[in-house]
Amino acid sequence: MDLSGIFKYYCKECENTWNNSSVELFEDIETYSKDSQKKREKELDKFINTISVHLERYPSDAVLRKMWVKKGEVFLQKTLEKENIFKLEKMDVEDRKKFLDITKQFIRDARKFDDDLPIGDIMQAMRNVWISNALQLLFGKEIYYSKANFAYSMLYPYTDNYLDNTNIDKNDKILFNNWLEKRLLGEHIKSKDYHESKVSQMIDYIESVYPREKFTQVYESLLLIFKSQVNSLKQHGKENHLCKEDLLSISIEKGGSSVLVDGYLISGFMTKEEIESVSYTHLRAHETRHDL
């Protein structure tokens, strides 16, 4: 199966769907006032800030550390169960418990992997774990969490955010992209610094779950999101004046390839129908967020 060709076809279909969609809202769609949006944003900011402060107070004493862990998990569970933030009441009891357990485990794993990673970056990566869990339910699978889910989600702060950082020299980004492309292609290439070593370690995690020789399309999908991230750099800089059509194309390819990888990391394979479903799942999320 020509994954790149199929993906580009569905991206074009998504563009056509977007361009031909009505600007009128459905009568039964749930809407939120600006005041309601601001209230929810404040609640989420407070949630992230509380977690950040709690993580910074990591005690050295073993007894106090157990109490610290318990307190953090109780707070996290109560907050995630609040209907006005995450709407977990739509899940059955067993799936909700798995969702909460995965959320707590991911935060623990992220802290263990890189204790210096800002809480905002951890929460950004956490959102992708949630997307992965949602796709598992969509595909009729059980909610689960693996090294591959962890690694791909954690790649966001180390790759996408790195490329988006305007304080990093353009030449450094080019060198990093050259290195990363070779690493994604399976070359045994050395890491030249701490940043690259962390990225390489996460790719190692994916390879441990999905060996390259058996799951080739997992790595084809990773190359697609990589190329989409690089292509999205065209949106940066005052000298780049992209037309609306190009911005739409870049946004759909980047978002679509991101969810495509999530789909492949569920079991290592996807049918053409599942690829189509994933592509349109992204578009519906894209429409809901009003990114454009």
Predicted regions and their residues:
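Intrinsically disordered, low-structural-confidence terminal and linker regions
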Residues: 1-32
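Alpha-helical phosphate/pyrophosphate-handling elements in metalloenzyme active cores
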Residues: 47, 51-53, 58, 74, ...
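Low-complexity, highly charged intrinsically disordered N-terminal segments
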Residues: 71-91
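Aspartate-rich (DDxxD/NDxxD/DxxxD) Mg2+/diphosphate-binding motifs
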Residues: 136, 156, 160-185
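Inter-helical turn/loop segments and adjacent helix faces that build the functional surface
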Residues: 138-139, 165-169, 209-216, 240-241, ...
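Divalent-cation-assisted or electrostatically stabilized phosphate/pyrophosphate-binding catalytic cores
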Residues: 173-204, 243-251
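Acidic/His metal-coordination segments adjacent to aromatic residues that form catalytic metal sites
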Residues: 231-246
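Conserved small/polar residues in nucleotide/adenosyl-binding loops
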Residues: 281-288
